[in-house]
Amino acid sequence: MKRDLLLTKIEEYKNIMPWYVLDYYQSKLSVPYSFTTLYEYLKEYKRFFEWLIDSDLSKAARIADVDLTTLEHLSKKDMEAFILYLRERPSLNIYSTKKGVSQTTINRTLSALSSLYKYLTEEVENEHGEPYFYRNVMKKVATKKKRETLAARAENIKQKLFLGDETMAFLDYVDKEYEYKLSNRAKASFRKNKERDLAIIALLLASGIRLSEAVNLDLKDVNLNMMLVEVTRKGGKRDSVNVAAFAKPHLEAYLSVRKDRYQAEKQDVAFFLTAYRGLPNRIDASSIEKMVGKYSEGFKIRVTPHKLRHTLATRLYDTTKSQVLVSHQLGHASTQVTDLYTHIVNDEQKNALDKL
């Protein structure tokens, strides 16, 4: 979703929310939570508050009037009834034959509500320095996580990674082959953004930074002499991330055309730009997702930017055999989340042995 449209929709949701949700929004914006995350959370709150009113658990006539007392006194059975409602309500997708929403969606809803309840019962302070209330019903609600072993995850994900020579082959495909599949009109559009698109893909493959971190990069955050980028990690922490040397020529090529191609002025600090009605704007996450999907589908298999992050992590572990180094590169506090890459590499080694 375009940033301007995203902010417009956020304002629409804020206009119907209770005052304490607006306080929550402001607090999380300072962390900072991404606008995308906050937008998704506001959608979940709207759905929850509408259910409270429809179920007569709140006597409010509108969402903005749902009071704190209602949230404080909701029981575990009430929350379980809400989960059951999510499971059994008709799907909003008219093309879907499924009844209810997926477990992933339910988990996202519960995560949003847990975040709100934690804020109201632990983080916020009233005029007496106390939270608004103390009873957190969300701590009693169990979530069902998708059961899948690391080996199964590795098997599912490795087909969507560009390992070994495929990393450079993918970049070469975008650079030298992709446009020959296009019409003359499509070629003109491709050539306009070719250097930028290659720079984005190269940076993701060479650093493993998250999509949101790439989107939010400013010019001052990129040091091509040191091959470092400064990013804001989850939780608002700043981090310096090393970038592999193969990305440098692509980043330099983009910078050489950035000013003239996108009409960038001094105040346009975003590193990756797009032209909207002739004016430079920071590129948004959805544009990068579509771009990566389009190129990767033509090359091998349609993937997301997050799979490029997995690609870097797997290649780095394959080279170093160090989970600590990989976790530092990805910005993880623990090596536990890097266990996946050991399984992928071990599978690749086994496949290589089978060919001997």
From Swiss-Prot:
The active site is at R210, K234, H306, R309, H332, Y341. FtsK is required for recombination. GO terms for molecular function: DNA binding; tyrosine-based site-specific recombinase activity. Coiled coil: none annotated. Keywords: Cell cycle, Cell division, Chromosome partition, Cytoplasm, DNA integration, DNA recombination, DNA-binding. Residues 16-121 form the Core-binding (CB) domain. One of its GO terms (biological process) is chromosome segregation. Residues 169-354 form the Tyr recombinase domain. It is found in: Cytoplasm. GO terms for cellular component: cytoplasm. Pfam families: Phage_int_SAM_1 (PF02899), Phage_integrase (PF00589). HAMAP family: Recomb_XerS (MF_01816). Site-specific tyrosine recombinase, which acts by catalyzing the cutting and rejoining of the recombining DNA molecules. Essential to convert dimers of the bacterial chromosome into monomers to permit their segregation at cell division. Belongs to the 'phage' integrase family. XerS subfamily. This is Tyrosine recombinase XerS. It comes from Streptococcus equi subsp. equi (strain 4047). The lineage of its organism: Bacteria, Bacillati, Bacillota, Bacilli, Lactobacillales. The gene is xerS.
